[in-house]
Amino acid sequence: MSIKNQIHLNRLPEHIAIIMDGNGRWAKQRGKLRVFGHEKGAKAVKQVVEGCAELGVKNLTLYAFSTENWNRPKLEVQTLMKLLISSLKKEINTLQKNNIKLNAIGNLKELPSQVYKELTDVIELTKNNKRLTLTLALSYGSRDELINTVKQISVKVKNNIISPELIDESVINEHLYTQNLPDVDLLIRTSGEQRISNFLLWQIAYAEFYFTKIFWPDFTKEYLYKAIVNYQKRERRFGKTSEQLS
C-alpha cells in the first residue's frame, strides 16, 4: 500500500505548519551557492501546497522569512525577496485554478515596497478561495507577534474598551496575526534540527511535532504524507488521560 493510501482522510490535521529548513546546507553539499538552495526550495513549496490541497487539508502555514533573517547577508536577503516576487507572479494562476487562498502574517510593513504590493495584490485576488488557506509567515517572529498583541490589548484596556478581568485566550487569539486561523495540529521541521525558532509559540500549544532529517529542497509530497501518517498514529490527549478519551 502506498504511503498516501495509508492516510485516513477523515482524520486529517486541520492546520499544518512547516519550518522549511536546510536550503543552505542542501546547496553546500552540492558545491552551490545558498541561493541555489532557496530556488530549489521554492519547488518544494509547490509540492507541499499541491499535496495539502489534494488531500483536503484546510490550512497550511509556511515559515518563509523570520524577523531574524533580516540579519543574513544583504545579497541573500535581496535574492529571497526577488524569489518571493517571482514565485507570487508565477503561481497566481495556479492558486486561482486550485481555489487556494493566500494569506500572510508577520510585520509585513518591513518588506520591500514591491514585495508588499505584489503580496497584497495576490492576497486580494484570492481572498474568496475556499479549498486551502496558504499562509506565508514573512518578517515573522512569535515574540514580536506576542509583544504586538500585548500592546494592542493594553491600549484597549487604557481606553476602557476591554476590561482586564475579561482578558482570556479568545481575546488574545483575536489580536494575534493568526486571528482567523485555527491552532496548529501538526508542526513539521525539516533538516534534522529540533527546535521551534520563534515560530507560532502560542499557536502550537497542543501541536504534534514531526522532525525529519530531509533538507527542505528534497521534501516532496511523499514526505508530507509520511508526516501525516505518523501524526494519525498518535493519541492527542489535550491534558486528559487515555482512559478519558476512550
Which residue ranges define each predicted feature?
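Flexible, compositionally biased loop and terminal segments
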Residues: 1-246
